[in-house]
Every structure is written in structure tokens, then in C-alpha cells.
Amino acid sequence: GAVMAHELNKKGKKCLVIDRREHIAGNIYCEDVEGIHVHKYGAHIFHTSNKNVWEYMNQFAEFNNYINSPIAIYKDELYNLPFNMNTFSKMWGIRTPQEAKDIIAKQVAETKITEPANLEEQALSLAGKDVYEKLVKGYTEKQWGRDCRDLPAFIIKRLPFRFSYDNNYFNYQLGALEYRSVRFET
């Protein structure tokens, strides 16, 4: 909405942007608190593989180089996310993608789940018991406040799962953490 309104306004059109929230700009909205620009919904991680989009956005904001590479903790052990070869190497002491695929395939086959009915079954049928127990179950139940067996299966399909040693959460060529924010004016 904001981009469309901006572009139409540049062409002399008047625009009315309506948002269901009490403000415009969606999740990149910032509040001015005593002269400090506060990101209401958290830091803005911008990522794209489209160079034109990257150049367009750089007209409005300053970005710091940033790679999102989260870490999960399970029983005092650190695991890289998204699930990748660093994760599997730490978990199973292996080195190659084929070794990881073989372990996952064996664990998935052991579940005998053909039509997952909930998130737990979906995760087990995709990643096997070890990944589910160590890296999915606790986090998911904390995030949603519900048992994984009470959550729909589709939720787990959006987790990145890779067989490389790349710890970058996003598969985009261009990514950054917003340094100086876009200002939206009404």
C-alpha cells in the first residue's frame, strides 16, 4: 500500500491509505518516542534477490550489512538454524549431506506416518525424531502456547531445511538490517 501510494503520488495522484491498524506502514511502522525512532514490531530485516527492489528501497532507508543466522539451544548445546549441515554435524557427528539425508530418511521411515494429522506428525515425517525433539517441539510449543499435537500440520512446512553449511536464514542474495528507518507521513 505505502509503495503504491508513494508511486502514484509522484505521478500527481492523491491517495488514501487505509490500514486495519491505527497507523500506516504495517510491520515497519516506527514510533517517535522522545526523539528516538522505535521499531514497534521489532527490527526490520530486509531481504530480496531483486536488484531493482534493493535499489528502490535504498532511496528511503539506510541498511547495515546483515546475515540472519539464528542459534537454538537444547540442553546447553548450540545448534545453527535453519537446519543445515552445521546443525546435523553437531547433532550426529557427521560431515556430508548424504549422511544427514540417510539419518533423516531412516528416522522418517521409522515413524510410519503417511498423512500427518498435526504439527508433531508433520515434523516427524519431514525431519525425523532427533530434529523434532531437540529443535522443533519445545520452541514451537513455547511460541504457540499449545502442544504440537494440537497444532495444524501446515505450520511446520515453512521452516527452512538445507543440506549445505550456509547459516543464512534467508535464501536471498541481498539482505540487510535497517539502520535508519523509512519515514511514513500522513
Task: Name these PLM-found stretches.
Residues 34-110:
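Dinucleotide-binding Rossmann-like beta1-alpha1 core, especially the glycine-rich loop
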Residues 77-79, 86-186:
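Active-site/ligand-binding neighborhood in enzyme catalytic cores
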Residues 1-2:
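N-terminal Rossmann-fold NAD(P) dinucleotide-binding loop
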Residues 18-20, 48-49, 182:
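Short His-Asn-centered micro-motif
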Residues 9-34:
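Glycine-rich FAD pyrophosphate-binding loop
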